């Protein structure tokens, strides 16, 4: 009997079985996808695409579920998969594409768990794989989406870890990355070979644009462009895109549309649970001041086994009772924010601060904030203006927030000069405070000036934002200010 090494046979064949499994994975039907992949491995044991797609299942399980034990399992299985894939046909465009994408997926998971240093190294290695693939196979456009994601991720790695990427010769460029992903998403819509990968490109493009872009409406425009072509976009209403669309609508202050979109989601026992959608539903209902918002936060906190947005979930649950006037329930739930969850995302850090220092929000200002965030600007204006300043403002923090809220409401109403006036008052009075109001006032002022093409003024306020030392939402505010500076850099003398 003759024995031949695996690499003589191992190939990358994205055949019909693999395509069907990929569709199931993006619909979060992992059990069904696993059955298809097992059948494919039995029929074509030397096809390595099933190994790559199994990595997708683990990636989404970790990225959505955030369970530490699942992440540790993923850490071990991915190394085994790398060893198998490296025995494949090096001449195939899928060889480096698969290796690079697997590194990106693991980097994203590492970032979820705060492993930024290791994530930076993974991003650098993925960049090497995909850059080489682009040189060897310039017509293989799937590579563009991965490179775009790398450029975005390299641009959002926290400052205290970004030096690793610079030493390795990789500079982040968020806008360049978004453009590269957009090219892939647009091309895939008109090309049968790549159409299958359009959902994944859209997942990255819309999510990153909504998270990092200066204007959520731009992400809405992108999503609408592809939504108009549903007939050529099978699987549009899958859970991932419901999540993306709802996230964008939430950021854009389109609460009613976000809730309508979230109602399209109906989980089943065959589908991997996406509990964050309960949190997102609760958040939108809270922004609308719906009395049943608490039910969704309770379901999220009861079922989710991850670590992010737990503290924020307890805070938002506490707020649902605070705006109803139930102070005892507010104190009960805000207290729980100290004992569960991690301190990796700004929302959780801010929730932890509120619990630790017992900074109970001013109810009128809280309602104004929620209505404003939800896009109900008229309701927010009436709520704030129907009260005398003395009846609302009780503390120095209240006065600072009062002026900040006026600035935000005027900004949303298109009254830029009034917005800048109240942002200026907020910056003057709050620059040395640890609350986020002054720093975000500086950021929003920079965005107004950028919108008006007054780039020197925009730079002044972006730099002011970065110089402030508040401890609330610091990472995201600084990140947005840095991105603003990068956008306007070509227009500065």
Describe each model-derived feature in a short phrase.
Residues 11, 38-45, 89-90, 136, ...:
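Solenoid-like repeat scaffolds
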Residues 27, 61, 106, 113, ...:
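Structural motif corresponding to the intra-repeat A-B loop/turn of tetratricopeptide repeats
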């Amino acid at each position: 009997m003759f024995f031949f090494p695996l690499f003589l046979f191992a190939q990358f064949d994205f055949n019909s079985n693999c395509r069907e499994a990929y569709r199931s994975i993006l619909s979060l039907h992992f059990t069904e996808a696993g059955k298809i992949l097992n059948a494919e491995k039995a029929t074509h044991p030397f096809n390595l695409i099933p190994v790559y797609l199994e990595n997708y299942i683990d990636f989404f399980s970790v990225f959505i579920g955030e369970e530490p034990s699942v992440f540790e399992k993923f850490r071990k299985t991915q190394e085994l998969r790398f060893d198998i894939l490296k025995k494949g046909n090096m001449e195939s465009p899928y060889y480096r594409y698969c290796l690079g994408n697997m590194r990106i997926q693991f980097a994203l998971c590492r970032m979820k768990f705060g492993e930024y240093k290791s994530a930076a190294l993974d991003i650098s290695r993925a960049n090497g794989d995909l850059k080489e693939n682009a040189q060897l196979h310039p017509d293989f456009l799937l590579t563009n989406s991965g490179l775009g994601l790398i450029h975005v991720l390299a641009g959002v790695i926290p400052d205290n870890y970004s030096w690793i990427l610079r030493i390795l010769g990789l500079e982040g460029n968020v806008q360049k990355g978004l453009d590269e992903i957009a090219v892939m998403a647009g091309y895939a819509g008109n090309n049968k070979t790549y159409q299958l990968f359009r959902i994944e490109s859209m997942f990255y493009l819309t999510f990153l644009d909504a998270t990092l872009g200066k204007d959520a409406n731009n992400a809405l425009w992108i999503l609408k462009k592809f939504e108009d072509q549903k007939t050529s976009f099978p699987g549009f209403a899958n859970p991932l895109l419901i999540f993306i669309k709802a996230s964008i609508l939430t950021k854009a202050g389109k609460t009613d549309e976000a809730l309508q979109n979230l109602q399209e989601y109906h989980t089943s026992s065959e589908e991997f649970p996406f509990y964050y959608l309960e949190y997102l539903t609760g958040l939108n209902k809270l922004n609308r001041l719906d009395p049943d918002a608490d039910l969704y936060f309770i379901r999220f906190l009861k079922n989710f086994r991850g670590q992010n947005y737990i503290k924020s979930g307890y805070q938002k649950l506490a707020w649902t009772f605070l705006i109803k006037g139930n102070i005892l329930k507010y104190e009960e739930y805000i207290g729980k924010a100290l004992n569960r969850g991690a301190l990796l995302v700004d929302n959780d850090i801010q929730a932890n601060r509120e619990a630790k220092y017992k900074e109970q929000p001013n109810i009128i200002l809280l309602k104004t904030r929620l209505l404003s965030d939800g896009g109900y600007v008229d309701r927010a204006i009436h709520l704030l203006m129907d009260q005398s300043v003395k009846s609302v403002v009780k503390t120095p923090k209240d006065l600072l927030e009062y002026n900040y809220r006026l600035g935000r409401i005027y900004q949303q109403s298109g009254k830029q000069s009034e917005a800048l006036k109240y942002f200026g008052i907020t910056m003057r009075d709050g620059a040395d405070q640890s609350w986020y109001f002054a720093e975000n006032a500086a950021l929003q002022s920079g965005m107004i000036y950028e919108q008006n093409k007054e780039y020197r003024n925009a730079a002044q306020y972006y730099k002011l934002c970065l110089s402030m030392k508040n401890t609330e939402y610091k990472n995201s505010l600084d990140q947005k200010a840095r991105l603003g500076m990068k956008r306007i850099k070509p227009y500065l003398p």
